[in-house]
Amino acid sequence: VDGHRQDLSGGLPPILVAIDTTPLRQTRAGTARYLRGLLDHLDVPVREVSFPATSRLRTVAADAIWYPRLHEDGADVLHCPTFRGPFSSRVPLVVTVHDLAVLRRPDWFNRWTRTYSRLAVPRVVRAASCVIAVSESTKRELVDLLAVPAAKIRVVPNAVEDVFTPEGPRAEGDYALAVGTLEPRKNLQRIAAAVEGELRVVGVRGWGGVESPPNVVWLGEVSDEELARLYRGARCLVYASLYEGFGIPVAEALACGCPIVTSTGSAMAEVAGEDATYVDPADVESIRAGIARAFRPEPRRVADWADVARATQAIYEELAG
């Protein structure tokens, strides 16, 4: 991404910001939604440069080659939107941390992710000039688990796309909705057991086998427009995850005015405040009771991606200065 400082600061020399877009491979995952929202709203010209690396080992090898080259190519700032990044950097490094689940519960992840993260996460965060946390909850964990100085962390909450509003078509039927990459921490087995009637599930399959209960309708990946229809028509969103650093589906449902059932702890209360029904994600009866108590909130937006882009661009400006 070519970021021109004169666009914001009255004719100062241009800066060049390199952004690792590898997470876009995950399509609908939260990290991909974050990166897509950021890239779409940065007020700078964008130039895409491709480095082929299809396997994990080739990706690591490519990182070893291309990250050091950024300084030679004149980059002023490097932004890694996940933990994947250099262990040292001659260019000021920005790292976005979405959560620390891989350190808190490594058993939720496959062997490659566990091994790589145990090695990489502390080193990448240590190398960063600035760490962006998507919530105050994630900031606290960075301080507590990795001893990151609080002054090095900026909290920039996630946002939702403009399509998520209460106005518009609704999906038909009587159903509860679950949204997210299908992996153990998303707690789908308990959610399905708690839902009486149809549960529609939006998301790609991640790691960890998930059996298909008879009341579950798998929708896979859907467009934002279709997802907004599903939020508007749902009896409620059931987002009883065992752990989250933010929870973009909660923010999307809130923007659509969809009733929300979500977990105590993690960052969900930070996102939804008093506009959700909170449950114990480890207790099926608690989730079932929460679904029965769910209420329709007054629609509101946590933030817009333009806000996220402005805050992030200000960090680039500061580090390049």
Question: Residue locations for each model-derived region?
Answer:
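Carbohydrate transferase catalytic cores enriched for Leloir-type hexosyltransferases
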Residues: 1-321
